[in-house]
Design a protein with these regions (language model features):
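Structural preference for solvent-exposed beta-strand-turn elements
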Residues: 1-356
Length: 356
């Protein structure tokens, strides 16, 4: 195999597929990036058996073939080469010569035939969403997935499609994030759980442009994201997602409308002297139209405590200038939501002692 391409194109491609290279594996071939130039395009692929990414880069094929190269070594070499044309040539025993101007690197590769290809997925009836919308939905929900594997379902997000509405849900046992968007077309009801790791990596690759679309394809075991010159294939998390409907309520005793930025600044100041790792709650005292800053409130006075990080995480991803907070009592969850409920954040309170 012999190909040539610009450094900028190769760096971009390697950066995209490297997100699917495992950090630990007992299979050395999975630590590689496959360069496939067996057809008329140059395709880079990485696959950790749970997440696979494939992207096409611009370039010229002088001699068709394929080679698998160690991802870390290959990435380091490519990034440090001059900003010019790079030539990659593989020969006997998979020895590979990488040349750019006066720089030359000779590294050992592996047979492309041994590489674990992405599973074949029939791409029919795609769900189309703008890259901007999907990137935003992930940003506004991903922070409340669980960060450990004690409950696998909590490490993913529910994609609940019904008609022309897509609802994305995440939870970690202390909070729930829900984001609803309207789709351009109507689809059959479908519920799947997508790994949080997959969504984080997809979000990094998405351009975020409103006029560029990403197409989603679903099977019983996989989800496919197809956009630009890239395809991401991920295994789904098995199992039935949590029934959150019984935790959601429109009843409230106290409603507060507040400037989001002012509340964030207030929480930031209140936690200024709290050491990182200390589990001290922030106490919210709502009384006589006051919450230590100007608010509009309806209903009963209230004294309630929350983990400040959970409040900050939710408020930071809300784009509206003002936020509505709904409370029932000091033992019930707080809801942050807009009137149309395009977003809903549920946060459980924490116990505290002492007068405020």
């Amino acid at each position: 195999m012999k190909i040539r391409c610009l450094k900028s194109d190769l760096v971009k491609g390697v950066s995209i597929v490297s997100k699917a290279v495992p950090t630990k594996t007992t299979m050395p071939i999975l630590e590689c990036i496959l360069i496939d130039a067996t057809t008329d395009i140059i395709k880079l692929t990485a696959n950790d058996m749970e997440l696979g990414i494939e992207t096409v880069i611009r370039g010229q094929i002088d001699e068709k073939g394929m080679i698998a190269l160690d991802a870390r070594i290959f990435s380091d070499i490519v990034r440090k080469l001059p900003d010019n044309e790079i030539v990659i040539e593989s020969g006997v025993n998979f020895q590979t010569l990488i040349t750019c101007e006066k720089a030359k690197f000779n590294i050992s590769g592996k047979s492309g035939e041994d590489f674990s290809y992405l599973p074949y997925i029939e791409r029919e009836n795609p769900v189309s969403i703008s890259q901007f919308t999907l990137k935003e939905v992930i940003r506004q929900t991903i922070f409340s997935i669980a960060d450990n594997d004690s409950n696998k379902l909590m490490t993913g997000e529910l994609f609940d499609m019904n008609g022309d509405i897509l609802k994305v849900v995440s939870l970690d046992g202390h909070r729930i994030s829900i984001r609803k968007i309207e789709l351009k077309e109507s689809y059959e009801p479908k519920k799947i759980v997508v790994p949080g790791k997959t969504l984080i990596e997809v979000s990094k690759i998405l351009s975020g442009e409103a006029d560029s679309e990403v197409r989603l394809y679903f099977t019983a075991n996989h989800i496919v994201f197809e956009f630009d010159d890239t395809v991401v294939v991920s295994r789904l998390i098995e199992g039935e997602y949590f029934r959150i409907e019984q935790m959601l309520s429109n009843d409230y005793e106290t409603k507060v409308r507040i400037n989001k930025r002012e509340l964030l600044n207030c929480i930031d100041r209140a936690t200024l002297l709290v050491k990182e790792g200390d589990k001290k709650p922030i106490i919210i005292n709502i009384q006589d139209e006051m919450m230590e800053l100007k608010i509009k409130s309806e209903g009963k006075d209230l004294l309630i405590g929350f983990n400040p990080k959970f409040l900050i995480d939710a408020l930071r991803v809300i784009d509206d200038e003002e936020a509505d907070l709904y409370f029932m009592n000091a033992k019930a969850p707080c809801f942050i939501k807009d009137e149309g409920e395009s977003y809903v954040y549920l946060i459980l309170p924490v116990n505290f002692s002492g007068a405020v």
